[in-house]
Each structure stands twice: as C-alpha cells, then as structure tokens.
C-alpha cells in the first residue's frame, strides 16, 4: 500500500515495493535495491524499520526518484555524511547517480522528541549532521558501513540505538497512537473526528503533534487519505474523482486535486495517464 509501510521481516529482506514511498510512475530504477528489516525487542517501540538502499549507476544516466513524504524522522548512514532528516512536508525528488549504499533508521511517528530534546516540528524539511545529536556517531558510522553484511549492520545500529534510548515519555505513546489511528481508520478525515477518538482538546492535540510528530494533525490526516487515493487510482478505481474526493473528506473536487498536485507533483488525471 502506498504511504503505509509493510511489515518488515527480522533480518530477511523485504522486496522493494511501492510501499517504500516511491511513486509507481518514477523512471525505471536500474541497478537499484531497497530492503527493510524489522527491529527486535525494545527497539520495536522506537523504530519502524531499518532500511538499506543501494544502487550502481556508474556509466549510466542518473535516475530521478519521486518520493512521498511520511510523518517520520530518519537517521541515514552514509560514509562521511551521516545525517538526521526531519519530516518532509511536501513532494520531493531525489537524484541517484554513481554507486552508493545507504543504511537508514526510520523512527516511528511521534517518538523522536525525547531524542531531539526540542519540538520535532523545528526540524521539518531540514537535515543536519547526526554528530550534532550523537557525539560518537563517526565511530558507529565506520563500524556499520564496514560491516560484511546487512545482518551485522543491523546489529551495530541496534546496539547503538539501545545505548542511546531516552527515558520513557508517556506522551510518546499518545502521539504514536494518534498517528496510528489516522493511518488505520479511513473515516478520520478531519481534525474534529481525531479529537473525538483521542479525547483531547484541539490546542493540546496541535501542540502534541508539533512537538512529537513534526507536522500538524491536519497535514498527517491529509497525507494518509491521499495515500489511499493513490492506492485506489493505482487499482483503477474509482473513475469518479468527485466521489473519491468526497469519500476522503473533501468538500469539493477542486481542493482534492490541489492537495493531490502538491503531494504528487501532478493532477490525478495526469497521474493515471502517465
């Protein structure tokens, strides 16, 4: 399902699929591989999955990848430039060229505030060197990227994260639960419906999302509902965009098309025809 991460298998590679957040109409990936691995034990509360992305385009033209945003923070290990990436709030494009291997940690939505120590919304749309947050990251980067196989990479990353787990924060569970409710319940199309399910006042919910999730409740709701629109369009239904917009909670088709274009970079009609 686009926009929703499939269950990763512990130390067994998950086949590259649209669920990785790459649009199906991206150009052919060439010598490209994306695999995911589930965290074990205590890390499962903090990490959605580990991922490994590699490509070898030496002698070939660069590849452009359209990537969908998710309400997650990533820690990406690249030799000499390991960085932390905040929640990206819009459609973005990556250019792949040469040969590279990246090992990443995708944190669960809502868990990164205790690591960061300031609102996750403050790092939206930006990245910064991981050394600013983890002083020993250079040694970890060297050990991890010099590992003989992915199993060892996961072991190194897991050991590092377990040594840096912050104290328990009760609000983390609430934030994770709110995002999970949005992701799993297609009837949540407006902030009001989320407020009723979470039993919170709007100001409290908005503050929690900025601090813990890194995006507003409205943004997260729209993103997950638009991911559902993508899935339906990929499967050839429904043909009636007005009905689709209404089912996703939009007052009119024009607003739906506008949001779709902001996220995908093209209109629903252009997406279907591509």
Go through each PLM region and give its residues.
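DNA major-groove recognition helix of helix-turn-helix
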Residues: 209, 221, 259-261, 272
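Alpha-helical bundle regulatory/interaction domains
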Residues: 1-192, 197-202, 215-216, 231-235, ...
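A secondary-structure capping/hinge motif
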Residues: 212-215, 259-267
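DNA major-groove recognition helices of helix-turn-helix
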Residues: 205, 212, 229
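Contiguous, well-ordered alpha-helical segments that form the cores/surfaces of helical PPI scaffolds
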Residues: 227-231, 258
């Amino acid at each position: 399902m686009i926009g929703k991460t499939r269950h990763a298998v512990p130390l067994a590679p998950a086949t590259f699929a649209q669920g990785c957040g790459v649009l199906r109409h991206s150009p052919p990936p060439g010598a490209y591989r994306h695999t995911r691995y589930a965290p074990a034990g205590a890390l499962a509360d903090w990490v959605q999955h580990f991922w490994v992305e590699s490509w070898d385009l030496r002698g070939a033209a660069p590849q452009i990848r359209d990537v969908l945003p998710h309400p997650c923070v990533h820690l990406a290990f690249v030799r000499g430039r390991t960085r932390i990436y905040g929640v990206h709030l819009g459609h973005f494009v990556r250019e792949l060229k040469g040969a590279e291997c990246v090992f990443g940690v995708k944190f669960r939505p809502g868990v990164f505030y205790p690591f960061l120590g300031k609102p996750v919304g403050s790092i939206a749309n930006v990245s910064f060197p991981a050394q600013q947050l983890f002083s020993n990251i250079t040694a970890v980067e060297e050990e991890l990227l010099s590992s003989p196989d992915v199993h060892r990479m996961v072991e190194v990353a897991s050991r590092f994260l377990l040594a840096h787990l912050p104290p328990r924060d009760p609000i983390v569970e609430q934030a994770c639960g709110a995002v999970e409710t949005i992701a799993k319940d297609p009837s949540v199309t407006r902030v009001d419906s989320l407020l009723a399910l979470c039993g919170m006042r709007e100001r409290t919910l908005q503050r929690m999302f900025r601090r813990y999730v890194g995006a507003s409740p409205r943004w997260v709701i729209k993103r997950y509902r638009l991911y559902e629109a993508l899935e339906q369009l990929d499967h050839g239904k429904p043909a009636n965009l007005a009905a689709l917009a209404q089912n996703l909670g939009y007052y009119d088709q024009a607003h739906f098309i506008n949001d779709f274009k902001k996220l995908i970079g093209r209109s629903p009609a252009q997406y279907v025809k591509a």
